Amino acid sequence: RRRWVRFWSNLRTERIYIRAWRQSARQFGFTLTRELLLRTRGASLEFGRALLEQALGGGFCFEAVRMERIRIAEEIIRMESPVCKPGVRQTLDALHRAGVPAAVATSTSLPLTRTHLALSEILDDFSAIVTGDQVARGKPEPDIFLLAAERLGIAPEACLVVEDSESGLQAAEAAGMQRVLIPDLGPVSETARQSCLAVLDSMQALPPLLSRLRT
């Protein structure tokens, strides 16, 4: 029987980050569009830096805007408290009953990730947390997923990645892991969709799928 491990995007934080990026950029006299920011979803810091600097020109100070974005995002998160996507709690409970370990693998920094999980009251539900600041190469490179599998002590080919971004799917494929797509904000190509084990409408459809996979 195969052991399936969850790596997921479990909080409604993407919209917070977009708000924070746009607000921070305005303070520095720049306009960041939602469409441009969606292209950075799940990608490495280096990719995001190159994309935004190319789009906004030489006067754009990426690091200064990013640091202010972090401050704004933390403020929003603490004031509004992130909530889990519907189905996350049920999925975690199902995994615990089945004895399947779960991990978080996210491009977000470790401090922000731990804050998100703690405020959502699911921090203790994960056996491993791997963040973008812990690996040399971000998504779409496989490093973040490979490190998560290593920390769990499970072979990559026995892992199941649940993703909502194309760069995340590419990283999981490069790691040799099975993929499930639950689309969220950004577009995902038909090629990426077809490479997945399943494409679900919401996290609520995940527990039944996991149950079928383990039988």
Q: What name fits each language-model region?
A:
Residues 1-15:
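Asp-based phosphoryl-transfer active-site loop
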Residues 10, 84, 102-105, 137, ...:
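Conserved SAM-binding loop
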Residues 18-38:
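Conserved phosphoryl-transfer catalytic core
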Residues 24-25, 44-59, 116, 148-149:
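Helix-loop "lid/cap" segments that line or gate small-molecule binding pockets
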Residues 52-90, 98:
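Metal-dependent phosphoesterase signature
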Residues 93-96, 109-215:
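Asp-based, Mg2+/Mn2+-dependent phosphohydrolase catalytic module
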